[in-house]
Design a protein with these regions (language model features):
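Conserved beta-strand termini and adjacent loop/short-helix elements that scaffold enzyme active sites
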Residues: 1, 36, 118-120
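Conserved substrate/cofactor phosphate-moiety recognition/catalytic segment
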Residues: 1-31
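Conserved nucleotide-binding/hydrolysis micro-motifs of P-loop NTPases
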Residues: 4-5, 58-62, 123
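Short, hinge-like loop/turn segments at secondary-structure boundaries
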Residues: 15-20, 71-72, 134
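Glycine-rich phosphate-binding loop used to anchor ATP phosphates in small-molecule kinases
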Residues: 20-60, 96
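Short amphipathic alpha-helical segments
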Residues: 44-47, 64-67, 129
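A glycine- and Lys/Arg-enriched "phosphate-lid" helix/loop adjacent to the NTP-binding pocket
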Residues: 57-99, 132, 142
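NTP-dependent small-molecule kinase module
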Residues: 94-143
Length: 143
C-alpha cells in the first residue's frame, strides 16, 4: 500500500488517486496480498478479500522492526528511509489504543472471513513453517 500512497519525492497522492490505484491493484489479478493498515480503506479491502492475516504484534516489536529497516532498500517503499520519522513512531505507539479497536470491530463484522491472528515473531515463523510443510506435502502427492 505504501507504493500506492507515496511518490518517490516523499509526497503523497490524494485520497481519490489512492483509492483509484488501490482499486486497480485489486482488480488486476484474482490473487493479491495487500500489506498495511491504511484504516480508511480497510473495510473496502475486507469486502474483497478471502483471507485476513492480522499481525497483532507488541508495540516494541513493531518499533524495533521499523528501526531495523532504516537505511535498507525495500520493495514496498519508493525511497530509502534514513531517519526515524517521529510521527510514524507515534502512530505505532498509539496503535493499540487508536487503531486496534477499529480492526477488532471489523473482525466482528467480517467474521465469516477466515482470520489468522499472529501475536509474535515465533507464531509467524511457525505459521510459515506449516505452510512450507503443507506445500512440500502437496508436491509429494502430485508425483
Amino acid at each position: 500500500l505504501d507504493q500506492l500512497f507515496w511518490n518517490a519525492d516523499r509526497t503523497t497522492v490524494d485520497k481519490v488517486q489512492f483509492d483509484q490505484r488501490l482499486g486497480e491493484a485489486m482488480a488486476r489479478t484474482q490473487a493479491w496480498i495487500l500489506d498495511g493498515n491504511y484504516g480508511r480503506t480497510l473495510e473496502m479491502r475486507l469486502e474483497r478479500c478471502t483471507q485476513v492475516f492480522f499481525l497483532d504484534l507488541p508495540v516494541e516489536v513493531c518499533l524495533e522492526s521499523v528501526r531495523a529497516r532504516r537505511g535498507t532498500v525495500r520493495p514496498d517503499m519508493p525511497w530509502v528511509e534514513t531517519e526515524e520519522d517521529p510521527e510514524f513512531m507515534e502512530y505505532i505507539q498509539t496503535f493499540p489504543q487508536q487503531q486496534r479497536p477499529k480492526i477488532l470491530e471489523l473482525r466482528e463484522k467480517y467474521g465469516e472471513k477466515p482470520w489468522v491472528v499472529l501475536r509474535s515473531r515465533g507464531q509467524m515463523d511457525a505459521y510459515l513453517r506449516g505452510l512450507d510443510a503443507g506445500m512440500a506435502e502437496a508436491k509429494r502427492e502430485q508425483r
